[in-house]
């Protein structure tokens, strides 16, 4: 069995907005959410920038469930609920075992872990929180989504650094293609704004001091963000049978590994993932109109990704639109490619390519059309989403107009 898989609902929240429409509106307008972080979880750490969710949307999640959630799980549940509302779906005894969820996370449970560290080592507490372990496990977000919505089909977590959401979506597509499920919720979530995580990223010397400028010659690194993005995936037959509005089709998946270095990228792995994605979708290079680049804003990554795109697409590389929306929502780690999924499907829906914000100076090593600073109207029939994680774990998705 090899069923077509379509998207019928999307949900998200990040520094740009607390639902998918507001996120897309800010992307279209090229607005960046990057600024000073003010959360109390940084315990007085100053001079740190990021793309922070200032206020969570109103919700009716039961307090008993809330106290069992770390922030990354809460964000995933909020995004999943929005996606379900847009899809016009609910889960009940008739379909629960054919309806699952897969959520990718880059890191998990940071709030619970740091709170216990401070309580035990700094403040002399005798015991950790009773819910610290279930709060912190990487699969907690998927489990909380399942419990919140009553999903009893395939439910599990995925963690592969900043390719986590694309890997989660790819895994969900496979569940539907092989007939194990009819409907899946899939995406990613991350909430890295706690003291120890921010300091660890700063120690790597990849954090920009001002903002994220992907593909610009004066780029100085990435910027951290928090957020979640989720999509309702259905078999084409299931969606059409219930009269659902189809947003886009997930036409292809390409996965690969560099087998090279924990932190340095290699061009061959991303090249292989893009080629595999096109082959899986039955697409030619000329069919692709837009690539949402991994585009972290580091010198090495942006240079490598440009070269990989040129290798795969040849002369057509100069005809496509490319952009990195991390310039606006920052690098949301496990949630990054889920938010970029929203950018891809909305580009298809509205015929608008979101820009690479904060772009200032052309780089001869990154000389493709990166849609600098201003969104561009163009017909987008096929969009690719690139996610190239540390340790060389690569996941590329192809979205197609239906």
From Swiss-Prot:
PROSITE patterns assigned: KS3_1, KS3_2
Matches recorded under Pfam families: ketoacyl-synt (PF00109), Ketoacyl-synt_C (PF02801)
Active site: residue positions: 162 (for beta-ketoacyl synthase activity), 294 (for beta-ketoacyl synthase activity), 331 (for beta-ketoacyl synthase activity)
A cellular-component GO term for this protein: plasma membrane
Keywords: Cell inner membrane, Cell membrane, Membrane, Nodulation, Transferase, Transmembrane, Transmembrane helix
EC number: 2.3.1.-
GO biological process, alphabetically ordered: fatty acid biosynthetic process
Sequence similarity: Belongs to the thiolase-like superfamily. Beta-ketoacyl-ACP synthases family.
Reported function: Proposed to synthesize NOD factor fatty acyl chain. Involved in the synthesis of a highly unsaturated fatty acid moiety, which forms part of a lipo-oligosaccharide that is responsible for host specificity.
Name of the molecule in the record: Nodulation protein E
Species: Rhizobium sp. (strain N33)
Source taxonomy: Bacteria, Pseudomonadati, Pseudomonadota, Alphaproteobacteria, Hyphomicrobiales
Recorded name of the encoding gene: nodE
């Amino acid at each position: 069995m090899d069923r077509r898989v379509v998207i019928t609902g999307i949900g998200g929240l990040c520094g740009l907005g607390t639902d998918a429409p507001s996120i897309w509106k800010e992307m279209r307008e090229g607005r960046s959410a990057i600024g000073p972080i003010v959360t109390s979880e940084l315990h007085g750490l100053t001079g740190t920038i990021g793309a922070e969710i200032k206020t969570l949307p109103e919700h009716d999640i039961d307090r008993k469930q809330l106290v069992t959630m770390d922030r990354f799980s809460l964000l995933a549940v909020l995004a999943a609920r929005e996606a379900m509302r847009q899809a016009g779906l609910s889960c009940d005894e008739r379909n629960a075992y054919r309806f699952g969820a897969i959520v990718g996370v880059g890191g998990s449970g940071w709030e619970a872990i740091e709170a216990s560290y401070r309580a035990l080592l700094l403040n002399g507490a005798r015991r950790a929180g009773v819910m610290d372990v279930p709060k912190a496990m990487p699969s907690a977000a998927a489990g909380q989504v399942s419990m919140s919505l009553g999903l009893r089909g395939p439910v599990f977590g995925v963690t592969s650094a900043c390719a986590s959401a694309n890997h989660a979506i790819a895994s969900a597509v496979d569940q539907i293609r092989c007939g194990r499920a009819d409907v899946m919720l899939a995406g990613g979530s991350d909430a890295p704004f706690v003291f120890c995580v921010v300091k660890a990223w700063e120690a790597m010397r990849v954090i920009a001091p001002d903002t994220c400028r992907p593909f610009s010659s004066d780029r100085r690194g990435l910027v951290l963000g928090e957020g979640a993005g989720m999509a309702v995936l259905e078999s084409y037959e299931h969606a059409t049978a219930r009269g659902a509005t189809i947003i886009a089709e997930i036409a292809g998946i390409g996965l690969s590994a560099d087998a090279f270095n924990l932190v340095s990228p290699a061009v061959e792995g991303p090249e292989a993932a893009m080629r595999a994605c096109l082959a899986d979708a039955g697409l030619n290079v000329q069919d692709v109109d837009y690539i949402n680049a991994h585009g972290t804003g580091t010198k090495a990554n942006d240079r490598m990704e440009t070269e990989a795109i040129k290798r795969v697409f040849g002369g057509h590389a100069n005809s496509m639109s490319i952009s990195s929306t991390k310039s606006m929502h920052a690098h949301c780690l496990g949630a990054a490619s889920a938010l970029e999924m929203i950018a891809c499907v909305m580009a298809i829906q509205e015929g608008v390519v979101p820009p690479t914000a904060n772009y200032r100076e052309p780089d001869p090593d990154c000389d493709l059309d990166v849609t600098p600073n201003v969104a561009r109207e163009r017909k987008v029939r096929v969009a690719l989403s690139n996610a190239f994680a540390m340790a060389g774990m690569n996941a590329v998705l192809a979205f197609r107009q239906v």
